[in-house]
Amino acid sequence: MRSAQVYRWQIPMDAGVVLRDRRLKTRDGLYVCLREGEREGWGEISPLPGFSQESWEDAQSVLLAWVNNWLAGDCELPQMPSVAFGVSCALAELADTLPQAANYRAAPLCNGDPDDLILKLADMPGEKVAKVKVGLYEAVRDGMVVNLLLEAIPDLHLRLDANRAWTPLKGQQFAKYVNPDYRHRIAFLEEPCKTRDDSRAFARETGIAIAWDESLREPDFAFVAEEGVRAVVIKPTLTGSLDKVREQVQAAHALGLTAVISSSIESSLGLTQLARIAAWLTPDTIPGLDTLDLMQAQQVRRWPGSPLPLVDVDALERLL
């Protein structure tokens, strides 16, 4: 006997979260809970404003229609990426095919005063990998901050993300301030320039490895080995079903590329599932999931060690 529930939710964000020049005051999304006999599976559907093509309202309509079809015996997945991902997670939990083991290690997202960051990063146990957003300020400033961190902590490796913010000139201005002796400790720089060709040229000219992120979701993207390209960053909420995520990870690994499972600012429930997906598909790579602290609460499932208050399922709005 099948049953289902869909929950709508909204989490207040910390002040100062800006996506594509838009301040994000709340994170809005949906959960689907599927039940069959004694078994239960959950999934999160939370399109990311400015990045997802679909809106939260679009996703809700598609999800509710899919749930009705599933209750009637139809299991075909929807095409909309955020819905396909959430639904496939719920089905995988229901079928017990999403392993419970999780990788809760995070590459901490660094912002704020560089002196404070140095103290925090120097105390990190184990492999020191951190993420820095660049492209929000002047490229010269970004270069100086990155150089300072790499200089101060000799065993630190940085993942940088420019979100296609730079022209070729700005990319060169950034690189000019990063000591060539430290550049190999930049694990990769995600999408430095506005076009893929300019990003490839940046990698060739600077020796700084790059990673594809937004490019993976463009219709003309193909997985090929290229000089200077070291990694792909896979955001399942923007990608689609678990099968599609797994296909992309396998395609990257076949080329010797690092595949990084990354957050689209999901709630704690979605983040814990991403941690399980990372442990399953990319066990040797620290995922990019350090976004929970941007929110003011957790929901339904806790992220281990987080002090944020937990909102129970009973407090969420039911849609069925």
Swiss-Prot record:
GO terms for biological process: menaquinone biosynthetic process. The active site is at 133 (proton donor), 235 (proton acceptor). Mg(2+) binds at residues 161, 190, 213. Its EC number is 4.2.1.113. CDD domains: OSBS (cd03320). It is an enzyme of class 4 (lyase). Keywords: Lyase, Magnesium, Menaquinone biosynthesis, Metal-binding. Pathway: Quinol/quinone metabolism; 1,4-dihydroxy-2-naphthoate biosynthesis; 1,4-dihydroxy-2-naphthoate from chorismate: step 4/7; Quinol/quinone metabolism; menaquinone biosynthesis. Belongs to the mandelate racemase/muconate lactonizing enzyme family. MenC type 1 subfamily. Converts 2-succinyl-6-hydroxy-2,4-cyclohexadiene-1-carboxylate (SHCHC) to 2-succinylbenzoate (OSB). NCBIfam families: menC_gam_Gplu, PRK05105.1. PANTHER family: O-SUCCINYLBENZOATE SYNTHASE, O-SUCCINYLBENZOATE SYNTHASE-RELATED. This is o-succinylbenzoate synthase.
